[in-house]
Swiss-Prot record:
Protein name, as recorded: Membrane protein insertase YidC
One function term, GO molecular function aspect: membrane insertase activity
Entry membrane topology: Multi-pass membrane protein
Protein's organism: Coxiella burnetii (strain CbuK_Q154)
GO biological process: one example: protein transport
Length: 566
């Protein structure tokens, strides 16, 4: 076995370990929340799970961060309106007209619980996560409105492509407020429209605010299991995508203005995001942390629109969009620039996007994500064949030099400097690059990392079956068959390589496949499938290069002879 192959395997292993360590530090897991005890108020009633934020006069926009929220009980059933479409199950609280629950019926929590949908938004105090919106007055104070609706239940029926939920109410200052949510078939974007009628005798000034309020999930550490980013993020024309971790929000609140943009809360595969209605206007983005004694803090992120001026007897309208659903690039890209970056493909994002595009194109034909991974991997290996062949031939030439290098070692003995000079002179004379076997292989490492992120982060692979016992490519093989096959594929590569006379390298030939097999046991099945395919194709390529090496060397020698004659 060639020492350069050992070095390459070690580098790949270290890169993989570094990836895991980085994810464990930055994106800790989300365990189940611990229960809390509800405390009644003085009159025996439980306060609501939240109230609209208290805005105070600020700088330019006269708006500032959110105020306090009551967090001890859920919204009473009597105040809830339910909305059901083909992709969303939503609950709206008539006090404020906020969305306090959102479930995704097309995304079950697990293959074992297919009837239980993933829930993004929740009004439960222990896992508070709601999408709020409302109006502020000229002083930046929120206007609390008790809304009414024509029905308690709204359902998008067969044949309907649009569902409108209209809420009406009167604000304390006399404004007639109409809040309208519009849902569309096969769409996770919810369009929000506010209409304000000023029936008073005085002009009214105010703004629209939208925000996401979420209690931070408790954190604990797991090893060798990938977790994605969980926290806030925002985008603007200046910075298309910016992560705002809970730790960073603890240290400093958001307080900035931006034309258009968006703000979101992310978790693995899913997110919620508010997008301003008019990309030409400038909005004020803010955040606020609400300390909770003995419990995780609550985080508020949102934006406020420019101020509206409504004369007496006049009316005005404003709007925004709420997205609650899976992180699917084509859906997010159409809502706001940079929102698709919430698919956390890491620092090799452009390469990952290209690989996912290829993967999706293959899937459109074969209709199976497992076979798509195999075919895409084969295509990648074909593209990089020149680099692989160059690496294999370089290693073959280095093996040919081993007897001459051994002779140099015997000649120079313990004189390491003389041995080094003689070895480099031999390489120069034979026109051999000592790193020629490693560099072409290392060029492929970024593609491996990018494909790693594609398989880990793409919601399309969540609960995607392959064949036989592999029912979910996004989790580990339950029977560890794929990691064992991967280890065997590595052994096949080693057997194809000439055996080294060095006993240490011979041991490494057997140890490395075992180490990698154990290391990959908890990797998602899709990633192990990629690695198996990569090994098999590379083994076939190496076999072909070795078989044609002598003829290739003869052709190269003849070509050099012709050049010398010229």
């Amino acid at each position: 076995m060639d020492i350069k192959r050992i070095i390459l395997y070690v580098i790949v292993a270290l890169l993989a370990i570094a990836l895991f360590n980085a994810w464990q530090r930055d994106y800790p897991p989300t365990p189940k929340p611990t229960p809390t005890v509800e405390q009644p108020t003085a009159n025996g009633d439980h306060p609501t799970a939240y109230t609209p934020p208290a805005f105070t006069p600020g700088a330019a926009e006269k708006t500032k961060k959110a105020g306090t929220i009551a967090l001890t009980s859920k919204v009473p059933e009597a105040r809830l309106i339910t909305v059901r479409t083909d992709v969303l199950d939503v609950e709206i609280d008539t006090q404020g007209g906020n969305i306090v629950s959102a479930k995704l019926p097309k995304y079950p929590v697990s293959l074992e619980e297919k009837q239980t949908p993933v829930q993004i938004l929740s009004g439960e105090p222990n896992e508070l996560y709601v999408a709020q919106s409302g109006l502020t007055n000229g002083n930046g104070q929120p206007t609390t409105v008790q809304f009414e609706s024509a029905k308690k239940q709204y359902v998008l029926e067969n044949g309907q492509n649009q569902l409108i939920v209209q809420l009406t109410g009167r604000a304390p200052d006399g404004l007639l407020v109409t809040k309208t949510y519009t849902f569309h078939r096969d769409d996770y974007a919810i369009h929000l429209a506010y209409q304000v009628k000023n029936n008073t005798s005085k002009p009214w000034q105010g703004s629209l605010y939208t925000q996401i309020t979420r209690r931070q999930p408790p954190t604990e550490h797991h090893h060798f299991y990938v977790r994605s980013y969980n926290g806030a993020s925002m985008g603007s024309p200046q910075t298309p995508y910016e992560k705002l971790s809970y730790e960073s929000l603890d240290k400093q609140n958001i307080d900035r203005t931006s034309q258009s943009g968006w703000i979101a809360m992310q978790q693995h595969y899913f997110l919620s995001a508010w997008v301003p209605g008019n990309p030409e206007l400038t909005y004020h983005y803010y955040s606020h942390v609400i300390p909770a004694s003995g419990e995780p803090n609550v985080y508020v992120v949102g934006f406020v629109s420019p101020q509206m001026n409504v004369a007496a007897g006049s009316e005005a309208a404003t709007h925004a969009t709420l997205y609650v659903g899976p992180e699917i690039a084509k859906r997010l890209k159409g809502l706001a620039p940079g929102l698709e970056r919430t698919i956390d493909y890491g620092w090799l994002w452009p390469i990952s996007m290209l690989l996912f595009w290829i993967l999706s194109a293959v899937h459109a034909v074969v209709k199976n994500w497992g076979w798509s991974i195999i075919i895409t991997t084969i295509l990648i290996k074909i593209v990089f064949y020149w680099f692989s062949a160059k690496s294999f031939r370089s290693m073959a030439r280095m093996r040919e030099m081993q007897p001459r290098i051994q002779a140099l070692k015997e000649r120079h003995g313990d004189d390491r400097q003389a041995l080094s000079r003689a070895t480099m002179e031999l390489y120069r004379k034979e026109k051999i690059n000592p790193l020629g076997g490693c560099l072409p292989m290392l060029i492929q490492v970024p593609v491996f990392i990018a494909f790693y992120y594609v398989i880990i982060e793409s919601v399309q692979l969540r609960q995607a079956p392959f064949i036989f016992w592999i029912h979910d490519l996004s989790v580990k093989d339950p029977y560890y068959i794929l990691p064992i096959i991967m280890g065997l594929s590595m052994l096949a590569q080693q057997w194809l390589s000439p055996t080294s006379p060095d006993p240490t390298q011979q041991k490494m030939m057997w140890i490395l496949p075992v180490i990698f097999t154990v290391f990959f046991i908890n990797f998602p099945a899709g990633l192990v499938l990629y690695w198996i395919t990569n090994n098999v194709v590379q083994t076939l390529q190496q076999w072909y290069v070795n078989k044609t090496y002598e003829s290739h060397k003869a052709k190269l020698k003849a070509r050099r002879a012709r050049k010398r004659k010229r």
